[in-house]
């Protein structure tokens, strides 16, 4: 059960979900036609010790094994893998556009096992600030350093809780509020209550000068019936793989029905925003998965929002 001040490392709670995401990036990297390349994702997964359920995501036959349950379960597993690749590619492109426009200050909110500070080709002078729980940041930087991996930008860790006074910690790490910034909230908002989401964007806006940019993945809305169905399906997948499901992601997510539309909120608070539905972006890059349930429900899938400070 989540609390307002809960904490975690890379093996527990919200921290462990970063391992799942990294596993999807590793699988994508191994494809003959990858949308993105993350040469460090597999390393970060296999050293995390977060449990067999997450390492099983590296299995190239996972979709076929899920098909033994039923076609819809296989489609869901394939969708989750494809979605992570498309999401990563979308935000990689966002950062490429930001630095092409001259932005040299980047802040990744709840960075988890995000390896962009290491794998992207950043212009000289770029500083990437990563905000997350202290133990999550420490695991990533230590693991990569021990394997000879160095950042491709000036990387600065900001150990802070995004539900607390993280802007002060960011400034203490060297953040310049007078410089244009490219912000990213990827894989984050669903783990925040609705009011915390609004507060986060208010805090971002307070330290963003005109010309700053932000990109965010929205939190899709699922009813209790759908959540129960998803739990049952993932338990079946775990049973087929013969492994214990140690974390219920649905218990970590806040399913607030009154959560504000990110694009609308930003538009109302001094940003010029646009959004792209995840299914539309997946189709655009040729990675939509047929057979995914609720494909026609506009609230069931995330949106990718980008905005510029006015």
From Swiss-Prot:
Gene3D superfamilies: Vaccinia Virus protein VP39. Transmembrane segments: none annotated. S-adenosyl-L-methionine binds at residues 132, 161-162. One of its GO terms (cellular component) is cytosol. This is Putative S-adenosyl-L-methionine-dependent methyltransferase Rv0146. One of its GO terms (molecular function) is methyltransferase activity. Exhibits S-adenosyl-L-methionine-dependent methyltransferase activity. The keyword Iron does not apply. Its EC number is 2.1.1.-.
